């Protein structure tokens, strides 16, 4: 009968066969089966984290490398090639910031997911931000060297830089230039005066402030003339 004492083990092995009614002997297999499912779930967990870390590191290295190539092209006055390199660096930065569990579209449903880019250390966040700012700043410099300057893009990139670094002199000055050429003289003057407060003796800033003030004066005179012109004929007709 000592062998009969082993019957619960036999019952355990035989218990999974009849699914209709689980006898009391099925309670041991429950915890026994749970580890199997748990191990299947927990087994692959280290693999995605390692894969994400490798992808993140690779994206950051690629972004820094593309930025360096863009700087080299800019020094060689290959502005179009430099623009392409900076754009590729920004794409790599977006890929790095998108390396989060579950992907970018669904960060909110999971309460355990962090609000910022997942798996980015503080040093990596600083690297991403600094590289992004340098790329946008360099893009504006390249665009301003073009024969046909896209001032809307210059304005867009300058504002992106100022979102991260409000005290960036070059971005402030170039934003003023962009608004000037887009005909928004009030905003142009605001950014240019802000740039002058940081670099009071910069001749380019002072020159653009004078140009902007001249444009604003002309616009105000034209409005006065147009108002007077419409009022003049009306009085003549009445007379």
UniProtKB/Swiss-Prot annotation:
Entry-annotated residues carrying Phosphoserine: 7, 27
Sequence ranges of the TPR repeats: 63-97, 169-202
Region of interest (Disordered), ranges: 1-54, 98-121
Bias kind Pro residues: ranges: 16-32, 104-114
Disulfide bridge positions per record: none
Domain of life the protein comes from: Eukaryota
The family this protein is said to belong to: Belongs to the TTC9 family.
Protein name, per record: Tetratricopeptide repeat protein 9B
Species of the source: Mus musculus
């Amino acid at each position: 009968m000592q062998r009969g004492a082993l019957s619960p083990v036999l019952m355990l092995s035989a218990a999974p066969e009849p699914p209709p009614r689980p006898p009391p002997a099925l309670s041991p297999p429950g915890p026994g089966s749970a580890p199997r499912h748990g191990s299947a779930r927990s087994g692959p967990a280290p693999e995605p984290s390692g894969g994400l870390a490798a992808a993140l590191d690779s994206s950051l290295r690629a972004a820094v490398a593309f930025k360096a190539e863009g700087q080299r092209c800019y020094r060689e006055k290959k502005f179009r090639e430099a623009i392409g390199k900076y754009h590729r660096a920004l794409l790599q930065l977006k890929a790095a910031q998108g390396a989060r569990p579950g992907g970018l579209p669904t960060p909110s449903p999971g309460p355990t997911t962090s609000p910022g880019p997942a798996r980015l250390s503080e040093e990596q966040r600083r690297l991403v931000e600094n590289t992004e700012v340098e790329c946008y700043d360099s893009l504006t410099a390249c665009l301003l060297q073009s024969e046909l300057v896209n001032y809307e893009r210059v304005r867009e990139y300058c504002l992106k830089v100022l979102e991260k670094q409000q005290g960036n002199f070059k971005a402030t000055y170039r934003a003023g230039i962009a608004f000037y050429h887009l005909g928004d003289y009030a905003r142009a003057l605001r950014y240019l005066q802000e740039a002058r407060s940081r670099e009071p003796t910069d001749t380019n800033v002072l020159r653009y402030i004078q140009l902007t003030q001249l444009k604003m004066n002309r616009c105000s005179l034209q409005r006065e003339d147009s108002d007077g012109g419409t009022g003049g004929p009306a009085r003549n007709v009445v007379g």
